[in-house]
Amino acid sequence: MSRYRGPRVKIIRRLGALPGLTNKTPQLKSNLINQSTSNKKISQYRIRLEEKQKLRFHYGITERQLLNYVRIARKAKGSTGEVLLQLLEMRLDNVIFRLGMTPTIPGARQLVNHRHILVNDYIVDIPSYRCKPQDFITIKNQRKSESIINKNINFYQKYKIPNHLTYNSLEKKGLVNQILDRESIGLKVNELLVVEYYSRQA
């Protein structure tokens, strides 16, 4: 299944706020809640499905990518759900978004694809690149690259940067301080239901 490229407002009306997809936050339709509880068996599946869809649309990944992340998380030490969120949060496109360099993750992905971003002074054009502690993220020293970032950074820096990241506005440099904890996740989601969804699909 490919990435979603349709109307974003339609998605957040159904799933709730997804800041990585869009910064718009329309009101949820109240009748959706009543519909979701009309049948207990269907509603339980739907709840797990919607939690999974939140991750897909927020992080802008395909179904296959998300399944691969779940498989990696299962093999790692610790809580599968928490490891899954850490893997998604440490993607380069998401780190750029959380630093306030772009308004959305699709915007961050475009910067990476167009080779505007450097990690540890090397151009990285793979949005799924997994960042690690002590990685520093900068922009290519070109007028076009800097103008794109500056246009966003002045507005989105008013939002709080999570504790596992630091942004130096003078040097225009982002730093990954550490692996983030659960409280720093920028999305309201029940990751355990996502893990359960995939365990039931196997």
From Swiss-Prot:
Ranges of residues in domain S4 RNA-binding: 90-152
Pfam family, one: S4
Keywords tagged on the record: Chloroplast, Plastid, Ribonucleoprotein, Ribosomal protein, RNA-binding, rRNA-binding
SMART domains (UniProt xref): Ribosomal_S4, S4
Gene Ontology cellular component annotations, sorted alphabetically: chloroplast; small ribosomal subunit
Lineage top rank: taxon: Eukaryota
Biological process per Gene Ontology, one example term: ribosomal small subunit biogenesis
InterPro entries with a match to the protein in the record: Ribosomal_uS4 (IPR022801), Ribosomal_uS4_bac-type (IPR005709), Ribosomal_uS4_CS (IPR018079), Ribosomal_uS4_N (IPR001912), S4_RNA-bd (IPR002942), S4_RNA-bd_sf (IPR036986)
Gene Ontology MF: a single term: rRNA binding
UniProt subcellular location: Plastid, Chloroplast
Subunit and interaction comment: Part of the 30S ribosomal subunit. Contacts protein S5. The interaction surface between S4 and S5 is involved in control of translational fidelity.
Function description: One of the primary rRNA binding proteins, it binds directly to 16S rRNA where it nucleates assembly of the body of the 30S subunit. With S5 and S12 plays an important role in translational accuracy.
Alphabetical list of NCBIfam families matching this protein: PRK05327.1 (NF003717), rpsD_bact (TIGR01017)
Family the entry assigns: Belongs to the universal ribosomal protein uS4 family.
Protein name: Small ribosomal subunit protein uS4c
Gene from which the chain derives: rps4
